[in-house]
Amino acid sequence: YTLELNGDTVSADNLVIASGGLSMPGLGATPFGYKIAEQFGLKVLPTRAGLVPFTLHKSLLEQLQTLSGVSVSSTITAEDGTLFRENLLFTHRGLSGPAVLQISSYWQPGEFVTVNLVPDCDLDGFINEQRAEHPNQSLKNTLAMQLPKRLIECLQLLGQIPDVTLKQLNSREQQALVDTLTNWRVQPNGTEGYRTAEVTLGGVDTDELSSRTMEARNVPGLYFIGEVMDVTGWLGGYNFQWAWASAWACAQALAQK
């Protein structure tokens, strides 16, 4: 292999591509690795941002603007059934937090995600219990035992939480409230893209490489490791581990040559 680097020429028997993906271009991310793969005839799968915050349509974002900085426990489900139980964070651009970052890797443009904002509570049963013990307690104060005050105030302004006591809350209103808080369907406008994405989905097709050495099956001496490959993990260090593990496998193979 011959490389031209700033006017210098370097020759090597083996070439290892560890250039990463497209995430966080401000740190120097480029499509260099994908271009090398394509130059040698390897298949590169379509790329997109992963582990990335959602942006929201303007109308919904305006409704939720007072919630920026509010974090809640949640479960979030993609249309393919993938579910994560993590914290969700409202931001000035849309939705973030571990729950959203995780589900973003399973979301496709145009799809909805479904959010349960009270995953640790049987909300219908909780309201019934509170009504039996404190019938004159306001619905707002009852929900404040489970949700942040700012979220309750926002939902009140949007007409999602009636300004009533528990004994005044009728069954239709209660069911609508429970559905709003446990089955909130959101259609993201998109994501924040590679600028803030922690990983890149897609990349060099793993079928093109040896799973033992990371060497291209049909191009001897050419190796790909880390995020440039079509391998994406969850939050929690899995992507770091993949980078280290694939590098170790490649290094072992090179040492044995």
Question: Residue locations for each model-derived region?
Answer:
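A glycine-rich dinucleotide-binding beta-alpha-beta segment and adjacent secondary-structure elements
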Residues: E153-T232
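An anion/pyrophosphate-binding glycine-rich loop and adjacent beta-alpha core
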Residues: L42-R48, V52-R172
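A conserved FAD-binding loop/helix module that cradles the flavin
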Residues: L22-F40, V231-K257
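Glycine-rich phosphate/pyrophosphate-binding beta-alpha loops
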Residues: S23-M24, P53, T91, L95-P98, ...
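Glycine-rich nucleotide phosphate-binding loop and flanking beta-alpha elements
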Residues: L22-P25, G97, W107, R212-T213
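Glycine-rich loop(s) and the adjacent beta-strand/alpha-helix scaffold that form part
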Residues: N14-L60
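Conserved beta-strand-loop-beta-strand element in the redox core of flavoprotein oxidoreductases
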Residues: Y1-V10, L15, V72, A78
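Short hydrophobic core segments
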Residues: T9-G26, A37-E38, L88-R93, L222-F224, ...
